[in-house]
């Protein structure tokens, strides 16, 4: 009988890689070597984008809050400062959601911020 080097171990390792590469285009999902190289690149993108996701969402929330505040004659920075002075402790995610879904409630927050800034 011929000698078998890492027979079942290699098969399992290759199957695991090819399973993770499902959905990739062409040989990148069929051939082990191409799949492995693509997965290495995918891992770097995953690592980078887990961090970028936080930045991107914060930027989106700030844009939504700014748009809502400008509808009521205020810009983002004065609105946030007014909320801080008034002691309103809502994060940007919640503020953006209120601005998008509940304009009446956001109007109350804007009035609170204006009142706190004016003294």
UniProtKB/Swiss-Prot annotation:
Signal peptide: none annotated. GO terms for biological process: ribosomal large subunit assembly; translation. CDD domains: Ribosomal_L20. InterPro entries: Ribosomal_bL20, RIBOSOMAL_L20_CS, Ribosomal_protein_bL20_C. The keyword Ribosomal protein applies. Keywords: Ribonucleoprotein, Ribosomal protein, RNA-binding, rRNA-binding. One of its GO terms (molecular function) is rRNA binding. It comes from the Bacteria. SUPFAM superfamilies: Ribosomal protein L20. One of its GO terms (cellular component) is ribosome. Pfam families: Ribosomal_L20. Belongs to the bacterial ribosomal protein bL20 family. Binds directly to 23S ribosomal RNA and is necessary for the in vitro assembly process of the 50S ribosomal subunit. It is not involved in the protein synthesizing functions of that subunit. HAMAP family: Ribosomal_bL20. NCBIfam families: rplT_bact (TIGR01032). This is Large ribosomal subunit protein bL20.
